[in-house]
Amino acid sequence: LHLDVAAFDFAGLYPSMILARNISWETRSPTPTEFACNLSIPRDFSETKSEHMVYFKTDELGVLPKAVMELKTLRDEYKRRRKEAKNKAEYTKWDNNQMAVKRLMASFYGVIAKQGFGWADVTLAASITASAREAIRAAAFKIQEME
């Protein structure tokens, strides 16, 4: 046990980034939008280079974020049913279902990042990981401010 230590966890970090930035094949934008991903690793948030920026449209939800949203809704339903289970077998059934959906959502990144796979897109994969790094760094800076 350690004093003054807290655990911090992002629920489904990569799927959350897909949804938060509307990251999808058809939503990539050639012009700047509010959904921007900085593919470089800046030391602080003021360091950005435009050649390392990827933008995603904000006017319509992309195919990938829609899929994440629908799966999150389905997973929440399975978790609700698990909570209401009357016996161990029912609990196990709904727990297995929600875990399957969780793994499916997590696999989206792998499918996009796997070169040679039909849906692979290095820029999308990099946008997801860059967004995740940014979220982790923002959380770390926020936590440091609280000290």
What annotation goes with each model-predicted range?
Residues L1-E147:
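Conserved acidic
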